[in-house]
Amino acid sequence: MKKLIIPFIFISFIWPQDFEPTNMSPIVAYWKTLTPAQKETYLFSYMTQTYETYEELKNELGHTDLTKWYYDNRAELVFGIFDQFKDKDLDEFVGWIDEYYSHEEFVNQPFYEAMAFAFRFQQAAGETIWEK
């Protein structure tokens, strides 16, 4: 009996206990490899691209349902963040995005969701997530 239990215990330590793999978004994997300065550049580039896409939609299509959807679901948040730049630094937004992606349940969420999280917490009073 003892000979049967020892291999079983040994195998249970070798075999991984968590069979559910984490599906990390490629954007999150890329984000985690960047330095803080590179993250600021990436965030600003993402926001600039969103702004330019919205402007192109307005110029090419006018104020259609697609343009309205893009504004409501993507551009409005970016415009709100741009408005915050006169009071807040870009590195504060980067810090909140890092905080968002530090939680395992959010690593498969799109970058837009992390920006929304950063924007909400940036506006709240307090210095840490517990104070907010």
Language-model-derived ranges and their functions:
Residues 38, 48-57:
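Charged, low-complexity, helix-prone segments enriched in Lys/Glu/Asp/Gln
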Residues 19-26, 53-132:
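Compact alpha-helical subdomains of small soluble proteins
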Residues 17-44:
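Immediate post-signal-peptide N-terminus of mature secreted/exported proteins
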Residues 3-16:
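Sec-dependent N-terminal signal peptides
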Residues 9-12, 42, 50:
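Residues in flexible loops and secondary-structure boundaries
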